[in-house]
Amino acid sequence: MITQGVTGFEWDEGNRDKCQKHGVSVDALESAFHKTMAIFPDPAHSQDEERFIAIGKTSEGRSVFVAFTLRHHEGETFIRPISARYMHQKEVDYYEKAIAKIDDR
């Protein structure tokens, strides 16, 4: 699992502001990573570092889309959110149907 062994999150003014601009608080975003998330590589945006896309639910049950990378400092690994936004209902419906198909196998 990509997030296995992660120590915590790496925040600064830039990524905090970018997420909050889309209405996603630090607490909401972090809570989503404490639940089950679908995580995919994002090769289209991985020029300088490997990036990932995560889709999941916050502790309030809202569906969230997160772009992030992993940063390594002094032997520890941190999730560095790049951007996050709440998903539109059409996206939520598509995601839930896709998950249901996987579960039916």
Region annotations inferred by a language model:
Residues 1-105:
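Ribonuclease/tRNase effector modules and their secretory precursors
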